[in-house]
């Protein structure tokens, strides 16, 4: 059906054209839509929509003529339905994967309840708070003066990465790259560079297979002054004097890929210092992006008033542009507080409520490791979503999500909206126009439920199901053509890079600007073994995977464990009890526990993240007394509790821990037992099973050079002492 016939059948289109508009925008159909392979175009029905004047609202809503609001809303709903019919024919919805809920996807029932229980806000109150963020918000929108200080208006310099990334990319290039991703005809070309003697980076950029494309090392200035910051941010953050150098060594590494809108996967060193420094930088970047987006809209509002016939594409489907995912309310408090302090805005609505619900001065026991004290300090509640709306004079916390510029959430909190069991409450339209995404402290999130992060990516940058006051005449074409993923910048910060982190940045990000990752060279003296301080036999067993199949790796590991390690335990020439088997993955734990129950006569017990407190106490006591020969111990329980397991004489690591601190903490169980005179270090052993796929964890435990030898040499058994 032609577009003209659609208009004839729908009276809502009649007499509804923007006055003075000469040209209509086009929506491209994919070439596969016609038998002849030609490209069809349809007049953008949304071009004919007018909108009521709303200059005071700084959002993705444009100004227009005044008319009856109820009539306008009815027309817009019908027009949007027509537009969705066209768009969904271009971009069919993939079938939803059936998600199987098992124990590994549940939150640990008992974890931290004795030390970090948050009784201030119950789960019901938290859920209502989140749902309120989706309700219609009829607050006064005349709170943002559409005028802006002329000194702080951007010059739209083509050298500004904000302009070159979002506004200067040829449409033909975007279409070709988008089609290449769909047909899996994309490859990444990479270059390596040095950051220091012990750190390097890898920059990779997507190119269409068959095209001659030279990928050069990204421009490095290591200076914040190389980028176009808003004047308000310069004044607020002391960046007016270019003779000063405000950046730390860490920030100099990150400033270029960050402000060039490249995807980032960054592995940092220090919990306290490094986290504070990279948050300073990304808070500045986020604010700069929000301010530039707002000012561009305001400037184009003025241009349209001067010349209504011009076309200005500067908006997405919905207002939110930044999504920040953090593990706990404590981290959310620190991030939001950082954003407020750097914003240059004094008025913050509902700041007291936010501090009451997110700030907590409680500290974990000092007997726990320092890393534990850092991760679990303050408010450890992991169920929240909060919106931040920026006007010229104020920041509004707890704003309606569709009226927010920034959304700060936990994986569990936003999961409740995206995958709500009540289908009527499911929504993801507010994620349709995200241009910057930050995942902070991924290493902590991985112990909550990493699948929630992948769920978020499934819902990003989709075409909305409903209209949300968007001016279709100003929506960028790459939003309409469902190409926003090519423009979205994703930044992931973690203490330890893991396979899951690599999977996110490599498999779920399509940024046309490429991705930037750092890699740290770990000397043997800085490895876990080098810092253990114990002279104990540490034996590493490698098993090979036929065909290097990642999918079959768990089966090969289990086969090696049951055919080599279990017989060794049964016929042990060392201690007959006190054997601790450390298992990082819960599914592996279930498999091993079932095997030992059904196939062996070994007297064993187990403690895991789902054990009741009674089971935890009973099995730990029996193991310490030697009445249990073997104890199965999960990594997730260790992360949340950091128990001191007594009675340990030997350790078997079913897989190298991703966190190298855990390796030393578990090995020291033997050392503490030896100090009490209950074991002999000359008889005790530590065994670790690994494959080539464990390279990331292995190099943190034995060092980078040793890990390469262990992974690729002919020998399959290596011993350290």
Swiss-Prot record:
Residues 1-168 are annotated as: Disordered. InterPro entries: P-loop_NTPase (IPR027417), UTP25 (IPR010678), UTP25_C (IPR053939), UTP25_NTPase-like (IPR053940). The keyword rRNA processing applies. The keyword Endoplasmic reticulum does not apply. One of its GO terms (molecular function) is rRNA binding. The modification Phosphoserine is found at residues 53, 63, 196. Residues 55-72, 140-161 have a biased composition (Acidic residues). Keywords: Nucleus, Phosphoprotein, Ribonucleoprotein, Ribosome biogenesis, rRNA processing. Pfam families: Utp25_C (PF06862), UTP25_NTPase-like (PF22916). It is found in: Nucleus, Nucleolus. Residues 15-31 have a biased composition (Basic residues). DEAD-box RNA helicase-like protein required for pre-18S rRNA processing, specifically at sites A0, A1, and A2. This is U3 small nucleolar RNA-associated protein 25. It comes from Saccharomyces cerevisiae (strain Lalvin EC1118 / Prise de mousse) (Baker's yeast).
